[in-house]
Amino acid sequence: MSRLIVRGLPSYLTDARLREHFSQKGAVTDVKLMRRPDGTSRKFGFVGYRSEQEAQQALDYFNRTFIDTSRISIELAKKIGDEELVHQREERRNRRNAGAGPEGSASTSDARKRKADKSDTQQEEGSGKKKPKKGGAISFEEFMSVMQPKAKRKAWQNEDALPEQTMQDIVAPEEAIQKKAARKALKKADAAAAATATAESTAAQPDSGREETPEPDAAANDVGLTDEEYMRLRMKHRVGTDLDTLEQSSSGPEFEQSDNEKDDDDAAADSDPESEDEPIHDQGFECKQAEMQRKAQQAAEKDQKLVDQIMESGRLFIRNLPFAASGDEILAFFESFGTVKQVHIPLDKQTKASKGLAFVSFSDPAHALAAYRAKDGSTFQGRLLHLLPAVNKDALAETGSKKTATLKQARAEQKKQDATKDFNWSMLYMSSDAVASSIADRLGVNKSDILNPGANGGADNAAVRLALAETRIIQETKEFLAQQGINVDAFQGAKGPRSDTTILVKNIPYGTSAEEVEKLFGEHGEVDKVLIPPSGTIAVVEMPVVNEARLAFRAIAYKRFKGGILYLEKAPVGLLTQHKVGEKVVKQAPIVGKSIDSSNPSVDLDGPAGAGAGDEAVDGATLYVKNLSFSTTDERLTAFFHGLSDFAFARIQTKPDPRRPGARLSMGYGFVGFKSIDAARTAQKAMDGKVLDAHTLVVTFARRNAEASTTSISSGGSTKILIKNLPFEATKRDIRDLFSSQGQLKSVRLPKKFDNTTRGFGFVEYSTVREAQSAMEALKHTHLLGRHLVLQWSHLASSTQQQVDMQRSKTKQHFVNTHDNAARADPSKRAKIKLNSAQISEAIKQAKRQRDDVDDDE
């Protein structure tokens, strides 16, 4: 958790002051002071950091410290929906419900009554007079005494003693019982009046001539009734709710209660002493239940709508992101749920800064839904994320353009969309015309002289001559890119991740300048760097803003430029190894450049790689070092053995890193060479068991065959090369002319079908490993007749062929022995020549060899 909760803050503290205080221990991404609706501080807040480590350091440093004179306490903030928070919330709710229940209400009301009685007693003791209660029995008695006629009043009645007598009645416990009985009688009278209202309206009218005599008012003489209760008895229509009446009628009310029914009512009252104070049916509760159900249904419909949008688009809209968050960080945050196609961060057009928003597109909409469920409201670099479904803009664009786009426009748009995917062209693809123009301009001859068969005693095939020219241009291009800080090995990681800011511009016409390329891409955003090799056949463009680079890629891909079509491809990640922020554009003249010497290959196979490779070790003086730490480098191993006498070299065996194109990983072992065998023996005894980088070394003498085998497999040190994707029109002579430029060939083989056509692959074998390696480095990006030659080492194929030959020889020996034993068993029978399958296959193989020899002679 990278978010902290800070308690005990001063009430006057501001957000800026809180941010400044906590910025001492890391990069603060969010500050939130909690306030009341009136704006006053609640004296606690939240602080977010970029990483959990920074948050933990701030917690250890600031906890129980002071801001001004207030001591603060800090804890790691809980996530939304945490079980502990839910449990605490339920406990508080239960305590409130317990305090608001019947018993709690009664106890609260009793306490209030006692407090009121106490205050009245204190007031009476202090003043000697008692203030009569409003609406109590005193006011009613005063009213009745005043309203009585003088004939009925007693002349000697002492009116001053009335309040005191009434107070005694109130204090007497019998009054509560009388009030309760009066309340029951009131309810029964109300129920009877409500039930007989209709009957009285439709009943026969009494004799009009007879005058009804008024009945005596018994309630007027009942001193136990209050003013409100008396007035309620005299009202024709009941004011208030009829819930009590409905409940009484549902239980079978009668016009006049019998004794048994009265007993039943008394029993019901005894069983539920609070029934007369509480309504039987709570219409408010039912309304609340209906409202809650309606809100729950609306929430479910809204959630289902969000799910449908996510499943349709597979795209999420993220809010409240840190402004410093990068696309790679967001990608790493969401890629645990599935494959992320794209992360788009909108930027401000003026400042090029993030707006705190992002769009994340998933390959599978189910993965997007899982990310929405898990990460909505989660903490990312100290901020609480808010996730929403995003609309698929590609679908909207397709819907708007389907009606107006022609077939040609639709195909062009499809090509642009496919350009963002895995590109099928070679990374160093160059236009054949540009290659010929570059070589002709450099040599000062016409292009026809370059392509003229047999010119200057060269190859007779124009395709081979053009392929050789392309090979030369590619070597110069690779050297130029290496001088500019480009990782050339990254071009081999075709299936690795691609950069969103570096673009390879291919198939550009010869003579294109860096200014023209910069102007072409500058229409869509800021251009940081443009690299054009001396040949002028390819360009590397770097744009610092990801969104602008994506826009330029979509706009320029397959665009016509100077009579040609531009092919764009995203460069591999790690291509620019020495990139500097804000570096000026490198404007290289198309023809300016120094060509390389092809006789000096860049890779030396025979000598040991790594530190100290310039010295040569004698045979049998190489040590094999095991149990090396994966963090140990060649320099570290060299420094460890450099103090020994006759030290020659030290290297660590490595392999390509599949996650980082162009990088290599240690294999945990290496080799150390010495100039003499005696020095190697001394070093083996001295260094065996030593500790290097917390690892105990195991030092033994290297076996030459094992070392050669390991070197051959790891570095591709073989003399035979497998050539794939060969044109079907290519002949053995074309392959020989192309590959013989890199060294002396021992054999060239093109497997053919039964109709004597090639099968699209072949084999070439050199005399030495150095020549084979030189050919591999020089020709792996070359095109022949428009096809990219795919080169691989064939040492695995050779080992497989050896196993097949051994199995064939065993099978042949088995059948020969069986035939000889049968002939010895019955010598009288005439022996017949029988060929088994192994012999037949051997005969076919021999015939093919003879036919290949004839082709070589031709």
Curated annotation (Swiss-Prot):
Keywords: Nucleus, Repeat, Ribonucleoprotein, RNA-binding, rRNA processing
SUPFAM superfamilies membership: RNA-binding domain, RBD (SSF54928)
Bias (Low complexity) ranges: 191-204
Pfam families listed in its UniProt record: RRM_1
Superkingdom to which the source organism belongs: Eukaryota
UniProt record, GO biological process: rRNA processing
Residue span, RRM domain: 2-79, 314-392, 501-573, 621-704, 719-796
One GO CC term, this protein: ribonucleoprotein complex
Role, per record: Involved in pre-rRNA processing.
Protein name: Multiple RNA-binding domain-containing protein 1
Species name: Mycosarcoma maydis (Corn smut fungus)
